[in-house]
Amino acid sequence: MSYVNDVLQNLIAKNPGEAVFHQAATEVLESIAPVIEANPAYEKAGILERLTEPDRAILFRVPWVDDQGKVQVNKGYRVQFNNAIGPYKGGLRLHPSVNLGVIKFLGFEQIFKNSLTGLPIGGGKGGSDFDPKGKSDREVMAFCQSFMTELYKYVGADIDVPAGDIGVGAREIGFLYGQYKRITGLYEGVLTGKGLTYGGSLARKEATGYGLVYLMKEMLATKGESFEGKRVVISGSGNVAIYAAEKATAFGGKVVALCDSTGWIYDEAGVDLAAVKQIKEVERKRLREYKNYRPNAEYHEDGVIWDVPCDIALPCATQNELHLEHAETLIKNGVIAVGEGANMPSTPDAIHAFQKAGVLFAPAKAANAGGVATSALEMSQNSLRLSWTFEEVDQRLHGIMVGIFNQMAAAAEKYGHAGDYVVGANIAGFVKVADAMLAQGVV
């Protein structure tokens, strides 16, 4: 542990004020300590020092003109963290909370998530503190074109392939891709999450949510449980939450609550997903509109969604949204399983509480890997100049998620932590990347 502790202390000292990056690195490094101790070659080669330092961190300004003719300037980021097993791969996040520490945390997590998929993709992440909410289509286009005018220098189908994340959906990907193509003249798979008319993949929108539920299904089965007849609470109302709800419902669960950034809905009869899709995907409005479709449902702007009793909880909104007190409430109300659809949505003390109480817990880097897995399948289709059917992509996704579960379960058991999927996911993701780094020398 002394080597691990030394690396962590050095990381914290060299990256002050980046709390979420410290949190992510601490969780991973502490859980892989048994592997490090069993393999002295990792320390000799400085694997941890190299793994926790990005290959490069790109920071740039993004000037654009709003609808009033005023010049606005945002910060743009792309952190290319590790490409030992493939080109950098990870989303772009547009949100006021974005800073270098947030992007580094997301990029670091992406290394292990991408490794777990079994596909040849490295880890990266990017974004900006630009807020697309309340902006016109023209303003979003102006921002995206300016952002790509700088980013295009650093990305490419075999170099770095960004995708969507919070604030970046089909509209934004379209604007970004159009500008890349205009500047470079290249029609290549440089972005994933593209529209179906210009190289996108069927099932990409559904992938993260579906993948989460596929993995949860495997995990529940280890205890003789399933989604059938279970009450499910899901935070968020974006792609991950909506399609996790859709697949959980298909497996016999009853989704009773969803939320967005202004409030949450509770529908004892089961959430009407058609209404939610209309509100969020078509009208781009708030969940408060849900009562117009289901008058008997409840809408709350106070309290938290985790107060709703449930059997299965799926945090799918944002990092550190589920705290210790929320975990204690869920445990008291009889939750049996928690799966992270967002990136690091549970605080460390919340995770510890779930594990101590015997609640099945699926960490984000495994549970939400379906999105990036299907992005990699989109890359494959672009390279092959083919388009697979929805069923074929979904079948491949299901196989990948089963494989991820089996990997992390086996790794946890091998190192004496059977049933601890946090440790299992970290170890399984780490070993593949570390061994590739060893093979490639000190680079």
Model segments located where?
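Structured beta-strand/loop patches that form or line metal/cofactor-binding pockets in enzymes
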Residues: 41-70
